[in-house]
């Protein structure tokens, strides 16, 4: 069985104990300014998706205990960039937790893995050049 309504995937929300710190990190890392709704909620909007960052005080609005900050070990937050090597050079002075430097993956993407201040895994990648199919 599946839903009959059309759906659009539009955002990922990170729950954090320190919204300002995490927003500052993602603004610096992506060059995308945040739009603040309240002190507990901000969004970094790109043309293709939105990264929402919310404080722990928002969790009870959904269901108490339904989300916990800094407790993610299964999701990778991914950003496509023009030049992952150039980005790595720009981030090196202030990002303390690189998981791996720029690496070409078996599927061809060039990826840079790091952890944000809450420990979430973040992948900045440059897509592989795709051969044109005739």
Regions found by a protein language model. Name each.
Residues 21, 84-87:
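Short, conserved charged micro-motifs
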Residues 13-18, 106:
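Conserved beta-strand-loop-alpha-helix junction that forms the acyl-donor binding cleft
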Residues 15, 78-80:
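Short hydrophobic/aromatic beta-strand micro-patches
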Residues 1-10, 32-78, 86-115, 126-134:
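Vicinal oxygen chelate
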Residues 22-27, 91, 119:
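Conserved active-site tyrosine of GNAT-family acetyltransferases
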């Amino acid at each position: 069985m599946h839903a009959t309504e059309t759906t659009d995937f539009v955002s990922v929300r990170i729950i954090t104990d320190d919204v300002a710190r995490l927003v500052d990190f993602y603004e610096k890392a992506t060059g995308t300014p945040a739009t603040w709704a309240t002190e507990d909620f901000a969004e970094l909007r790109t043309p293709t998706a939105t990264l929402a960052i919310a404080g722990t005080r928002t969790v009870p609005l959904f269901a108490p205990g339904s989300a916990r900050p800094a407790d993610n070990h299964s999701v990778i937050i991914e950003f496509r960039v023009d030049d992952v090597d150039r980005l790595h050079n720009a981030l090196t002075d202030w990002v303390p937790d690189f998981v791996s430097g720029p690496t070409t993956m078996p599927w061809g993407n060039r990826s840079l893995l790091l952890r944000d201040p809450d420990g979430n895994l973040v992948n900045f990648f440059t897509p592989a050049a795709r051969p044109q199919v005739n």
